[in-house]
Amino acid sequence: MEFKRDNTVRFYGDEKQTIEVGEKRVPLFKSTTAPFMKQEVLPKKSKTRLKIPRFGRFKVFPENFEIERDKILDPGGDAVLQWNRVFLFWCLVALYVDPLFFFLSSVKRIGRSSCMTTDLKLGIVITFFRTLADLFYVLHIVIKFRTAYVSRTSRVFGRGELVKDPKLIARRYLRSDFIVDLIACLPLPQIVSWFILPSIRSSHSDHTTNALVLIVLVQYIPRLYLIFPLSAEIIKATGVVTTTAWAGAAYNLLQYMLASHILGSAWYLLSIERQATCWKAECHKESVPLQCVTDFFDCGTLHRDDRNNWQNTTVVFSNCDPSNNIQFTFGIFADALTKNVVSSPFLEKYLYCLWFGLQNLSSYGQNLSTSTSVLETMFAILVAIFGLVLFALLIGNMQTYLQSITVRLEEWRLKRRDTEEWMGHRLLPQNLRERVRRFVQYKWLATRGVDEETILHSLPADLRRDIQRHLCLDLVRRVPLFAQMDDQLLDAICERLASSLSTQGNYIVREGDPVTEMLFIIRGKLESSTTNGGRTGFFNSITLRPGDFCGEELLAWALLPKSTVNLPSSTRTVRALEEVEAFALQAGDLKFVANQFRRLHSKKLQHTFRYYSHQWRTWAACFVQVAWRRYKRKKLAKSLSLAESFSSYDEEEAVAVAATEEMSHEGEAQSGAKARHHTSNVKPHFAATILASRFAKNTRRTAHKLKDVEIPMLPKPDEPDFSVDD
C-alpha cells in the first residue's frame, strides 16, 4: 500500500506519538496496518513503546512551516526592490568614504623643517560613516539569507517557482556570494588606521607604513564588484536603475566622479609616500654632526631636544624640496609638494585632488610627466587606461539617457517634417495646411507623443478597466445623462470610452451624414446647428459646452429592439469653436451599453435624456412656437368672426330700409317732382349696402383660408426605448 502524506495532516512530536503499554492506552496508529509499523523491544527497566516510522517525526506542524515561509522575501517584490535601492545608495557612500582614509596623513611644515601627522578629527568623522556603511553591508547579508530564489529547473514557463525553504536558501547563498559579501563588510580600514598603524609607528617610527592602507583597499575591489550585480537586479525588476532619464545621467556622472575621487585620493597618498621616501633616502646619507633618525619625521617628536638640534643642522628637508634644484625626482607628485597640497586643510586638498583626478581621466593622463619610478609609471598607465574606458562609458551612457528624453520630440519633429513634405507634394491649399498643423500641434500638447491606446491594450482587462475608471469616471459623471446610472453601467461605459481631440473649425459631423459615434464634451465648445425645421429658411444654432453631448440619434438607434445595420443620419451639423477634448462612444460600443440600459425600470433616465438632448430642446421650442401661432390664429379668427357678424347685421338693416323706401316710392308715384327727388337719395344708400355685403363675403372667405392653412411643424425626434424587453 502506498502512503501519501497530505498537507492537512498534523504530525505530533515524540512525546505525543509514543504510548505506554503499562497504562494500556490506545496507540495513536493502532488502526494502521502498514507493514513498516514495528514494535521495538526495550530493556525491562524501560517501558515498551511503539516505534513511530521516520516519516512521522516532524517537530514543526505544517501551519507553522507556512508561517516560516511567509517570512521569506520575494526577490521581485517591492520590499526587496526598495532595499536594493537603499543598499545601492549606501554602497556608493561607502565607495566614497573609503578613499578618504588616504587624507588622514599630512605634512606639517614648521619653519625649515617638516613632519608627518595624522588628522584625528577627520579620522573620527570618516570612521563614523564607514562604520555606518558597514552596518548596511551586514544587514544586506541578513536579508539575503531570507530572500527566496527562482529554481532553475522551473524556468521552462513563466517566471518560475520560488524556493522558500530557509535551509536551501542558506545553502545556495553560502556557496555563491557569501564570501564576497563577508569580505566587503569587514571593518578593515578602521582596524588598520586606529590599531595597526599606531602600533607600527610607535615601534618602528616609519611613516612608510601608509602603504599598508593600499593593501587594505584590496577590500575596495569586492565592494566595487557588488555595485554591478546589485544594479543588474534593479534593472531586472524595473528595467532601469533610475526612474527618470536625468537621474540616470546623473548616476553615470556620479560613477565617473567616483573614479576621479579614487584617483585623486590615491595620488595624494602616493605624494605623501614619495615625500617620505625622499626623506628616508636623504636621512640615510647623513651621519655627521648628528645622526638622522626616522623618528624625527614624526610630529610626535617635536618636543624632543635632540630632534630640535637635528633640524637646525640637517639638509634633509632642503634636499627634498621640489622647488629647489635637487637630484631626487618627484615626477607626477611634484605639484602636490610645490603647491603645498599635502599641508593644506582638508577641503582645499580634497578639491584639488578631485580636480587632478577629473582632469587626468578626461585627458587620458596626457598631462602627466612621470619619472623613471616603476610605481609611478604603472600609476600613470592605469590612469590612461581607466580614463579611456570610463570616459567612453560616460559619453555613451549619458548620450543614451539624454537621447531618451528627446526621442519623442525628435520623432514628432520627423513626423511634422514628413507631414509638411506630403502637404507640399499634394499641393494642399493654405487653409487645409493650417488646419493640419493645428491638429498636429494640439495632439502633441495633449499626448506628448504617447500612444495611450497601445499602452492600455497591452494591459490585462481587469487592470485596463480600473485605469479607465480612474481616468474617466469623474469626467463621465459630469455628463448629466450618466449621473443617473449606477456604477456597473458606468464601468461598462468607461471601459469603452475613447479620447477624441478636435481643433478649432473642425467639423465633427455634418447634417445628413451617418452618425458613427456619440460624443461627450469634457473641455471646449461646439456649435450645433440645423436647417431641418419643416419649412424653408429654418435655422437653429446652439452652443455645446462641457457636460453636453451630441450624436443622440445614435442612442435612439441603439435602443431599438431590432436596430438596422444602417446608421442613423445626423439632424445637426456640429463644428468645433475651439480646441475640444471629449470622450467618444462608437456605434458598436454604444449598442452594447444601450443593451445594459434596458435594466433601468425607471422613466427618470428618459426624462433626463429629453431634458439635456438639444434635439429635443429644439423640437420643444418649435412645438411651443407652433402652439403660440395656433393660438394667435384662433384669436384672429374669433375677432374676424365677430367683425363679420356685425357687418352682416348692418347689411340686412340697410336692405330693409332700402326696401321700405322703395315701397313708399311706388305708393307715391303720382307726384312726379317729389318722386324723382326721392329716387336720387335712395341710389347712394343702395350702393353702400352692396359694398358692405361684398366686404363681409371677402372677410368670411379670408377667415376660412386662414383656418385651413397649417404652419409646418418640426418632426418629433425618435423616442429612445428605455423599457425592458419581456
Curated annotation (Swiss-Prot):
What is the role of this chain? Probable cyclic nucleotide-gated ion channel.
Q: Self-association or partners: how does it assemble?
A: Homotetramer or heterotetramer.
- Stretch list, region Calmodulin-binding: 597-612
**Where along the chain is a nucleoside 3',5'-cyclic phosphate bound?**
481-605
- The answer to whether keyword Nucleotide-binding applies is yes
Which cellular component appears as one GO term in the record?
plasma membrane
Give the transmembrane region(s): 87-107, 123-143, 178-198, 212-232, 253-273, 378-398
Q: Where is this gene product found? A: Cell membrane
> By its UniProt entry, which CDD domains does this protein fall under?
CAP_ED (cd00038)
Q: What is the recorded membrane topology of this protein?
A: Multi-pass membrane protein
Residue ranges in the Cytoplasmic topological domain are: 1-86, 144-177, 233-252, 399-726
A molecular function (GO) term:
cGMP binding
Q: Which UniProt keywords apply?
A: Calmodulin-binding, cAMP, cAMP-binding, Cell membrane, cGMP, cGMP-binding, Ion channel, Ion transport, Ligand-gated ion channel, Membrane, Nucleotide-binding, Transmembrane, Transmembrane helix, Transport
> What domain comment accompanies this record?
The binding of calmodulin to the C-terminus might interfere with cyclic nucleotide binding and thus channel activation.
Q: Per the database record, which ranges form the IQ domain?
A: 617-646
Which residues does the entry place in the Extracellular compartment? 108-122, 199-211, 274-377
Q: What is the taxonomic lineage of the source species?
A: Eukaryota, Viridiplantae, Streptophyta, Embryophyta, Tracheophyta
Extract the InterPro entries matched here. Answer: cNMP-bd_dom, cNMP-bd_dom_sf, Ion_trans_dom, K_chnl_volt-dep_EAG/ELK/ERG, RmlC-like_jellyroll
Give positions of region: Disordered. 707-726
Major localization class: membrane
Protein name as it appears in the record: Probable cyclic nucleotide-gated ion channel 14
- Which family is this protein grouped under? Belongs to the cyclic nucleotide-gated cation channel (TC 1.A.1.5) family.
